[in-house]
Amino acid sequence: MHRSTFIRTSGTSSRTLTARYRSQYTGLLVARVLFSTSTTRAQGGNPRSPLQIFRDTFKKEWEKSQELQENIKTLQDASGKLGESEAYKKAREAYLKAQRGSTIVGKTLKKTGETMEHIATKAWESELGKNTRKAAAATAKKLDESFEPVRQTKIYKEVSEVIDDGESSRYGGFITKEQRRLKRERDLASGKRHRAVKSNEDAGTAVVATNIESKESFGKKVEDFKEKTVVGRSIQSLKNKLWDESENPLIVVMRKITNKVGGFFAETESSRVYSQFKLMDPTFSNESFTRHLREYIVPEILEAYVKGDVKVLKKWFSEAPFNVYAAQQKIFKEQDVYADGRILDIRGVEIVSAKLLAPQDIPVLVVGCRAQEINLYRKKKTGEIAAGDEANILMSSYAMVFTRDPEQIDDDETEGWKILEFVRGGSRQFT
């Protein structure tokens, strides 16, 4: 296969080289013709027409090109013979055999794979396989129980705290509700995470006697000069006429450039959103909130969502998404079934964008994530599975729109965060 590819490449290269020689030769002829014409005119000899000069020069150069013609012919003959050579034929035969062989091997591997899958399934369902799994599960349980005293030692806890530096949640994982609460309390106690602080709106309103005289800002002075003086109004009118309203192409281009440069330094929508959250809570930062989303808020909400925990979701959801979810749960309740899903893994928790919602410019953060989950619904009376499968793992995408209520920042659970929109996107079977 490689050899035939080389042969085809060699033929293509020879044709390319031939075209290159011809192109270089033609350029050389034209250059010499022009040079001869300019030389004749400069010397002031017998005037000859440009056509005569071109004909004579071309004839002389063509006579000198026998070597070039022979090289071109040699290359063409070599490329033609190469295609008919024994090496070329052998390489092509080897290539075709390799193709046929790969097809046969592919079919054989597929058949072998199906056979192995059948054998593995039978082994898994056999009595020996079932007994082995039970023994392994019992052994794992005993090991877990025997290791529990080690987990309670001071050294183990200190090592665990050092290893968990707050970045492990970035790469996925999921811990239980109790573990989340304990970790949150531990982080607050150790100072890794600060409690939300409600801004004091009354701060700074007390009257303080000082000797400092109030000074008018420079910008205010400029505005007063433009609006209240004759000279200022004249300058402003001249600026509008010569700059703002001018249709001169040069002025239009310069105006666009200054607008672009000014836009670089303008405050973006995202910075305005973060500034508003910073005013509500001086301890707020993008990095700390993203970590809090990964470690506590998103796992808390998604677990409640797949388990049908209406009480937890009512704390986090605003009225609109909560009413939608409550209506769904009401239908399940009427059918005497309840949700008993599980979250296995959460990853990709990121703040996608920051927006100001019109018309009141409400600051919001759009958060996205992916979760591996099992959706189950059980009968209330017997606990039997009514819908779903414990072995069916789904990969689902979620999107949430967060805002913050300044009046509830001191809430120990939510710290004022509310979900305005909650969307469960597409789900596919995880394999």
Swiss-Prot record:
Gene: TIM44
Localization per record: Mitochondrion inner membrane
Assigned GO CC terms: extrinsic component of mitochondrial inner membrane; mitochondrial inner membrane; mitochondrion; PAM complex, Tim23 associated import motor; TIM23 mitochondrial import inner membrane translocase complex
GO molecular function: ATP binding; protein-folding chaperone binding; protein-macromolecule adaptor activity
Gene3D superfamilies according to UniProt: 3.10.450.240
UniProt protein name: Mitochondrial import inner membrane translocase subunit TIM44
Described purpose of this protein according to its UniProt entry: Essential component of the PAM complex, a complex required for the translocation of transit peptide-containing proteins from the inner membrane into the mitochondrial matrix in an ATP-dependent manner. Recruits mitochondrial HSP70 and its co-chaperone (MGE1) to drive protein translocation into the matrix using ATP as an energy source.
Lineage: Eukaryota, Fungi, Dikarya, Ascomycota, Saccharomycotina
Disulfide bonds: none
